[in-house]
Amino acid sequence: ALGPHLLSRAAFDHLCAEQYTCVLWNAIPRDWEGDRNWVQRAIDLCAGQDWTLIVLHDLPTGAMQYLHEFLCRLEDNGFDIEQDFPPECLIVRNGVPDRDAEKYISG
């Protein structure tokens, strides 16, 4: 889950000072659980919002053996895969913080 535990103040200040961009996500299909069910959860998350940015975890759980299935189902359901991000997922852009960035900073 996203929240104030995500970034320390020092990390956030560094991102801004060095003019980095920080991208978050708006969909978590719980793929780390390692079962095939994450694919359907991810499809449901995509269907439930206009622009979905899913975080997937490259962990040794076996979940990524279903990645091809997930990508095929996205295509079969008419979803587009893009390399740009929903504006609400960019909390820092080229060092400039979004007005909601503070809610992700601890301390």
Regions found by a protein language model. Give the residues of each.
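Catalytic domains of cell-wall/extracellular-matrix polysaccharide-remodeling enzymes
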Residues: 1-90, 94-98
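A short C-terminal boundary segment appended to hydrolase-like catalytic domains
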Residues: 96-107
